[in-house]
């Protein structure tokens, strides 16, 4: 009988999770805080979260508040870290340039229009990233065109007519408002079914 009691008392071994030294995440400029998800990720690696947030917010002071920045944090064994802040995410830059808030909802939907000149300027910004330093601008532009296609942004190889673009954006805003209303109605109907 004693062996059964000892088996019950014996606790399961606690398995310690070892996290990697590199943490890759997107953090909004000037908005780093100890709240989830960033705080727990840093705490698990033994970093002082408050000091990290203070340093990150100070270093991103020249960015507009809320801009998503890809960040690489390399944690050293003595609990210090190297912080690498990249340029804003490609999708954010493309959406800002096209003046849209969200990507396409269906396969063949066009949500915005950009010219090759816009893509060239964005490519010059992205070429400052460590990962794209030795990549030619032409190749970066091709990657941006593929991302535009994924988001539903139409790439024009000639200048955009301002009147035509304004009409497109007004029609697009009406369509997005209708889509959001439809989604809200579906969500409300689903909530009514579950109660």
Curated annotation (Swiss-Prot):
Domain of life: Eukaryota
Gene Ontology BP term (one): translation
A single GO molecular function term of this UniProt record: structural constituent of ribosome
Places the protein is found: Mitochondrion
InterPro entries reported for this sequence: Ribosomal_uL11, Ribosomal_uL11_C, Ribosomal_uL11_C_sf, Ribosomal_uL11_N, Ribosomal_uL11_N_sf
GO-annotated cellular components: mitochondrial large ribosomal subunit
Similarity-based family: Belongs to the universal ribosomal protein uL11 family.
Quaternary structure (record): Component of the mitochondrial ribosome large subunit (39S) which comprises a 16S rRNA and about 50 distinct proteins.
Record-given protein name: Large ribosomal subunit protein uL11m
Organism: Caenorhabditis elegans
């Amino acid at each position: 009988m004693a062996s059964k009691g000892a088996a019950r008392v014996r606790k399961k071994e606690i398995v310690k999770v070892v996290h990697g030294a590199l943490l890759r995440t997107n953090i909004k400029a000037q908005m780093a805080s100890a709240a989830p998800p960033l705080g727990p990720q840093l705490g698990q690696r033994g970093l002082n979260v408050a000091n990290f947030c203070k340093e990150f917010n100070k270093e991103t002071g020249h960015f507009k508040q809320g801009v998503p920045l890809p960040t690489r944090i390399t944690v050293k064994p003595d609990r210090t870290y190297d912080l690498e802040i990249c340029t804003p995410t490609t999708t954010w830059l493309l959406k800002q340039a096209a003046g849209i808030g969200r990507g396409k909802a269906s396969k063949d939907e066009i949500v915005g229009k950009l010219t090759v000149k816009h893509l060239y300027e964005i490519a010059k910004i992205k070429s400052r990233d460590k990962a794209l330093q030795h990549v030619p601008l032409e190749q970066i532009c091709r990657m941006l065109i593929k991302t535009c296609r994924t988001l539903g942004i139409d790439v024009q190889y000639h200048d955009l007519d301002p009147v035509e673009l304004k009409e497109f954006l007004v029609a697009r805003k009406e369509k997005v408002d209708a889509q959001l209303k439809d989604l809200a109605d579906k969500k409300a109907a689903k909530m009514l079914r579950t109660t």
